[in-house]
Amino acid sequence: VTWLNLLGSDVMGISLNPIKGDNHFKILKKNLNIIDKRGDIRNVNFLKKNIIDFKPDIVFHLAAQAIVSTSYKFPKKTFETNVLGTLNLLSVLSELKHKCIAIFITSDKCYKNIEVSRGYKETDELGGDDFYSSSKASAELVFHSFYKSFIKDKNKFLRVATARAGNVVGGGDWSKNRLIPDCAKSWSKDETVVLRSPNSTRPWQHVLEALSGYLHLAYQLNNKKELNGESFNFSNN
């Protein structure tokens, strides 16, 4: 938000209420210049009212159920949030009558795991063995179908792209089952770190690297029509 403010933007954010206890928004909200709207992305009428009223020039869609373990407990809610939420936002944005750039953040987990040593390419097959990964793959398919059906050569106002983000690390992540925050919490209490998948190797990027990439993608999408409807990896995986 601060980055966008420094660039001269008026910012509106739509989100569920923050998690109880420590959370990034609670700590920073006094210093944020933002119109704060509370609601569920699954509620298309709520989305439509706030977006139509605000008339955004640029939209970054980061709302998601983003925890793999939670997706096993609540698969229906995970799909509703990640897939239906994407469809709802696309539907609302397609009704705008002014130019709008929209970046949909999905995940590099959207690819079918084919156990290769190279990094995945945007043209690789989508898939997912767990509910979180498959919901993100499904969101990509919904995005692609909506673009082909209702935006490409049909909507002169809306340009869209997806950003497939990899693992990020940075301040303010209090979600459960986060490797780096869990290490910091355990070490601060002189406790042993519990690793859920000790045989896995995970690449990381700082959260500001990913965010700067999203800003750059929005800028390029605004200037280059040929990027409309494309997907881009933001990961070192």
What are these regions (language model features)?
Residues 117, 128-135, 176-180, 203-207:
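The catalytic Tyr-centered alpha-helix of NAD(P)H-dependent dehydrogenases
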Residues 48, 72, 173-177, 207-208:
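Conserved strand-to-helix beginnings and helix N-cap segments that scaffold or border functional pockets
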Residues 73, 165-172, 194-205, 223, ...:
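Glycine-rich Rossmann NAD(P)(H)-binding loop
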Residues 1-165, 169:
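N-terminal Rossmann-like NAD(P)+-binding domain of SDR-like oxidoreductases, especially those catalyzing
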Residues 122-124, 135-136, 160, 181, ...:
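C-terminal structured domain segments across diverse proteins
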Residues 181-193, 204-232:
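Alpha-helical substrate-binding/gating segment
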Residues 70, 93, 97, 150, ...:
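A general structural signal marking secondary-structure boundaries and capping sites
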